[in-house]
Amino acid sequence: MVDLLVSPSISSLYELFANITLCFGFLPNYGSITVIGVGWFLGIIFVFYMLYPFFVFLMDNKKRAWISFCVSTLLAIIALTYFESDKYGNVPIDRHNILVVAPFFLSGGLCYLYKESITKFVCSQKVISGIIVSVISLMFFVFPLYKDGKVELLLTEVGLFSSWIVWTIGTTNKLLVNKVTKYLSSISMEIYLSHMMIYRAVEMVHIERYVKNGNMLYIITVILVMGGAICFAHIMKFYILKKITSKLSSFK
C-alpha cells in the first residue's frame, strides 16, 4: 500500500494485487516486481506452503529424504546450467524459483530428521562442533567459490547454512540462547512482515544525501531499519494486537 501511495500507477496496482494474493511465487518472472511488498522470499515460502503435503511425504523417512535431497540438488544444478541457456529463451533462473531453493528446504528437513543425533553430538562435542562450523564459515568467505557461478553459490550456501542449523539445533550457547534472542524470536514474524515498510520509510529520508561513504550508509540503514522494525513489531504485537484480541474475545 505504501508503494502504491508513493508511486501510484496501474503497474503498481497490478503488482500490489499480485503481492496481496501471496501466489506471485508461481509467476516465472516475479523477481522483477518493483512493488516490494512482503518481498520475493515470502513468495517462495507460500509456494512451499502449498507444496507442504508433498514435502512431508518426501521427508517421511531418512532414505526417502536423502534421495529427495540428491534429486532436488541435481535438478537445481541442471536448471542453472541448462534451462537458463539460449535454447530456453535465456530467462534468468535464480533463488526466486522454487526448484533452485528446494535443496535448502530439504536440507532443513534432513536436519530435523537427525535432530536427536545432532543434539547428542553437539552437546558432547561442543568444542569440535564449534571449530567445524567456524572453519566452514571462514572458508566460505576466505575462499569465495560462490563467485565462480550460480551452481557453486548454491552448493556452498547449502553446506554453510546446513552447518549453522546443525550447530544451532544442538547448542546451548548463551550467544544464541538468551533473553534477547528469545524476545526477538517472539516477534520475528512481525519483524519480517514489517521490515520492508520500515525500509521504505527510511528510504524517503534520503540518508545518502548526507552520508557519502557506502559502507557507513549501509550500516546506518541496517540499524535504522532493524531498530524501526523491532519497535513497530513490539507495539503491534504487545499493545495493538493484544487489545484487538481481548476485544474480540469479550464478544464471545
What are these regions (language model features)?
Residues 1-22, 46-48, 100, 129-132, ...:
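Transmembrane alpha-helical segments and their boundary/interface "anchor" motifs
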Residues 105, 133-242:
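Alpha-helical transmembrane segments of multi-pass integral membrane proteins
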Residues 48-60, 107-111, 201-208:
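Membrane-interfacial alpha-helical segments at the cytosolic side of multi-pass membrane proteins
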Residues 2-9, 24-34, 84-91, 111-122, ...:
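Short juxtamembrane and helix-loop transition motifs at transmembrane-helix boundaries
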Residues 25-27, 71-84, 132-145, 197:
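Aromatic-anchored segments of alpha-helical transmembrane domains
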Residues 6, 20-82, 232:
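Hydrophobic alpha-helical segments with transmembrane-like composition
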Residues 30-44, 83-107, 139-164, 191:
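Interfacial loop-to-helix transition and helix-capping segments at the boundaries
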Residues 5-8, 55-66, 113-126, 146-151, ...:
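Membrane-interface helix-boundary motifs at transmembrane edges
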